[in-house]
Amino acid sequence: MEVFPALEKVQSAIDNGLFAVGFITYEAASGFTPYLKTFTSQTLPLVSFVFFAERNQIIAGAELPKTYRPTAKWNQTISYEDYKASVDKIRRYIELGETYQVNYTFRLQAEFKGDEKGFYAGLCHAQSSPFCAYLDFGRHVVVSASPELFFRIDGTNLEARPMKGTFRRGRWLQEDERFKKQLLSSEKDRAENVMITDMMRNDIGILAQTGSVQVPNLFKIERYPTVWQMTSTVKASLRTGAKISDIMRALFPCASVTGAPKVRSMEIINEVEKDPRGIYTGCIGYVGPGGDACFSVAIRTAHIDRNLRHVNYGVGSGVTWNSSTDAEFQECKDKARILYEEDKNFDLLETILLENGRIFLFERHLDRLESSAKYWGYKFDRSTCISTITDFVKMKSVQRSRLRLCLSKSGEISINETPFSSIKINSLTAALATDPIDRMNRLLFHKTTNRSVYEHAKSQIPNIDEVLLYNQDEELTEFCIGNLVVEINGDLYTPPVSCGLLPGVFRAEEIDNGRLIERVLKKDQIDSVDKIYLINSVRRYVPIDLRAGEQDV
């Protein structure tokens, strides 16, 4: 179906009191404006909407699966070498003055296995976006966890919030805050954001009442599970009589997914990209009677083709003269991490020593719990937590025990107790892990009920008390239930947190008191140290007997 006739049907439907819900693919841009260059063939319809007589409000995610695990093996449609060649070509065009910035993208593809709604639930849970959408058109299913508002219309008020500027999330709170500040102060990202915001101002100016275009927010930093994003807000008063086709012709595709200037950048995109974008970087949304509307930019979005049992997911970044190929490629990988990361349906956890009615290192436990809650976006009230623990302790008569405190995402606290007599503290046997952990795994830096890394390590070496972990650079990290300490010539050393390990509260206490020194420890050094200890706030120092482990086969 042609683009304008399709939107005329949408306009007719809303004029007759119906709601229209659907999507417009990136390749529809040529249908709005013929000189906007795109691919001419794709499996998806260019425009697809369905109509409803009424709309219902539902609780988001109420009918979706509660847990999700990725089932697809994703393959890039482009090699790193080809990616680099395309970035170099874009930079040459910038050098020649033909463009200032180009949004360069590629696809991840996979055979689709599993349930479409389960896949959608996983994306929503992993991305925590305000514009999630599930559209089932029979053969074609579009699932989106977009964080970016394309435009919203409420009466005569029009608002757009272009998103341009990205930095990966840190692995723990302090690193995370440092990365946020780096994005906010990044000259490259600020320049990109201003460029795209100016384009949006100009595009919206076509639709707006004279003098009404404003930019109330510039360089706002928004937090998402895998990345920090920089956004700006553009507002205007919509002129009388603007139809949905007028709005799309003026604004589509969103400037944040093309580059500047739009026409030449889209020509370059058509030259360097290998395949059509489809729904990716198009838009998804609804428009209702009277013209109220909300559309997202279709990023963090996948297209499932049921006939082919195939799923397609796009990623990209804005290439400028100052771009680093490695940094841009890493940004694309960061944006794709929501496809790979494990289900984050876990509680935050603290394991606490209770002695004679007193909690050992209570403030440090609270500090770590609060830090992780802030990082993951969990609800946490420190005073409520203190009173809950205090009330629990008052009811206990055991002189020495271990408390296990769990904090849910909604802020609910649960506590259970284990008598200390059942805890082995004299010495433990241990062996080196059979394979390395990934130092970039964020779960390593937070104490949670997701113990999959440690459970896997323990399962590979049975008949041993503990497993000593190391990362992909063969740097020793920690044990499954405690931090690593080694003694060398009378001094005590422990690996730095950046190697990929939990910042233990007893470890922090010992470092602050000058009894422990941070130092990178290599896997091949372990046999030459004088003594090895496992430490945590319940057991304190436990001597380790390191043995050669045998893999369970």
Q: Whereabouts are the PLM-identified features?
A:
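Helix-start/capping segments and mature chain N-termini
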Residues: 193, 226, 230, 297, ...
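Extended alpha-helical targeting/anchoring segments
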Residues: 1-351, 355, 469-471
